[in-house]
From Swiss-Prot:
UniProt keywords, alphabetically: Cell membrane, Ion transport, Membrane, Transmembrane, Transmembrane helix, Transport
Protein function: Slow, weak voltage-dependent S-type anion efflux channel involved in maintenance of anion homeostasis.
GO biological-process terms attached to the record: chloride transport; intracellular monoatomic ion homeostasis; positive regulation of anion channel activity; response to salt stress; response to water deprivation
Lineage, opening ranks: Eukaryota, Viridiplantae, Streptophyta, Embryophyta, Tracheophyta
Tissue: Expressed in the vascular systems of root.
GO CC terms: plasma membrane
Keyword rRNA-binding: no
GO molecular function: voltage-gated monoatomic anion channel activity
Family named by the database record: Belongs to the SLAC1 S-type anion channel family.
Superkingdom of source: Eukaryota
Residue ranges annotated as Extracellular topological domain: 66-81, 136-150, 198-207, 265, 321-330
Record-annotated membrane-spanning stretches: 43-65, 82-102, 115-135, 151-171, 177-197, 208-228, 244-264, 266-286, 300-320, 331-351
Name of the molecule in the record: S-type anion channel SLAH1
Length: 385
């Protein structure tokens, strides 16, 4: 007896869906990624271009043939490296300015929040500082040229505008008193005025330079004393931003450079400011535990190590040119080497952690005022009662 066989036919459809039916979403994801990057971008990223521009200025001074204190090792530094560094700084600065301009167009509310933030508002000076340093280190322009002077005013006017707004708030606005908002980042405004003072002195505008220098130094003394007293505003400074403590080094170092350009010589005042920055640097270096929490994960705030040390290196070069002794040459060699090594290390770390660059910054996403959280809690408690 034969059992009837049943045949089973299996058909496999290998057809590929059309492009209309199958979408990867990559084309739609690109604008989303760009918008997310713009939303996360803030003025603190100009620390990168600020470091590049200050490093270019250091190299320009070190390879200058008229520098009498430069040893034969420094005199052989290739000028091509300086030109490459300057153009890299230019590309970085233009790129950051372009991206930040896009943020102002598409996310103006975020820019406004940054302006109201007690830390973020200080870094609105950073683009102007970078441009002024780039102008002073430019290899193709002389300070007496019309183009140089025009660009100087274009970059210096935003500094004066922010001075009037920010310093005016410290004096007159009850909720924006310096005693409540003071933090190490407040020294960025001081550095901006001092960099502008040096630029004016290089052009021979001594009256303008003295005006900017006096404005910067008066507010530096006020900020320094306020921070030294450890008032409530300083206690709200996030641990991840502690590299910004090196701005304590940058401010007197830049003041020394500006005064040297105004007077034409590295006199006693310039030396006093240099020694102050040197003392503060040693004080910070002797306290590595202060920066332990901030070094756990890469953050763009790490660039705050670079440009203050470059300012100190620039100061040491000017000091060595004045004293012409082994101690001055040794300080110049030490701080120039440290500055270059820190700068190169930051370049490598930034390239290795490029995927972390444009992430949401929880610091700027916090309250715009250090007292806002306490006020919010008290209001909630009142409403519950």
């Amino acid at each position: 007896m034969e059992i009837p066989r049943q045949e089973i036919h299996i058909e496999i459809d290998n057809s590929i869906p059309s492009s209309k039916e199958f979408k990867t979403g990559l084309a739609d994801a690109k604008p989303v990624v760009l918008m997310s990057a713009l939303r996360s971008l803030h003025a603190g990223y100009f620390r990168i271009s600020l470091s590049l521009c200050s490093q270019a200025l250091l190299w320009k001074i070190m390879i200058a043939p008229e520098s009498p204190s430069m040893s034969h090792m420094h005199s052989k530094l290739p000028s091509m490296a300086f030109h490459l560094l300057w153009y890299l700084a230019l590309v970085t600065q233009v790129s950051l300015c372009f991206l930040y301009a896009l943020k102002c167009i598409f996310f103006f509310d975020k820019v406004k929040e940054e302006f109201l933030h007690y830390i973020g508002v200080n870094y609105l000076y950073a683009p102007s500082i970078s441009w002024l340093l780039m102008l002073q280190s430019a290899p193709m322009m002389e300070p007496n040229s019309v183009l140089y002077q025009t660009l100087f005013w274009i970059f210096a006017v935003p500094v004066l505008t922010l001075d009037i707004k920010l310093y005016g708030q410290w004096f007159t606005t009850e909720k924006r008193f310096l005693s409540m908002l003071a933090n190490p980042a407040s020294q960025v405004s001081v550095i901006a005025n001092l960099v502008a003072a040096r630029g004016a002195a290089e052009m021979g505008w001594n009256e303008c330079a003295l005006c900017m220098f006096s404005l910067g130094m008066v507010h530096y003394l006020v900020i320094f004393v306020t921070l030294y007293q450890r008032l409530p505003g300083g206690n709200n400074f996030p641990a991840k931003l502690r590299p910004i403590f090196f701005l304590f080094v940058a401010a007197p170092a830049m003041a020394s450079l500006a005064w040297n350009s105004i007077c034409g010589t590295f006199d006693a005042v310039a030396k006093m400011l240099f020694f102050l920055s040197l003392f503060i640097f040693m004080s910070l270096v002797c306290r590595p535990n202060l920066f332990k929490k901030s070094m756990k994960r890469f953050n763009v705030a790490w660039w705050a190590y670079s440009f203050p040390l470059t300012f100190l290196a620039l100061d040491s070069v000017q000091y060595a040119q004045e004293v012409k002794d082994p101690v001055g040459s040794g300080l110049m060699l030490i701080f120039s080497s440290i500055s270059v090594l820190i700068f190169l290390g930051m370049m490598v770390l930034t390239a290795a952690n490029s995927n972390r660059l444009l992430r949401h910054d929880p610091v700027l996403g916090s309250a715009t005022d250090p007292k806002d959280k306490q006020k919010t809690l008290s209001l909630n408690a009142t409403n519950q009662n």
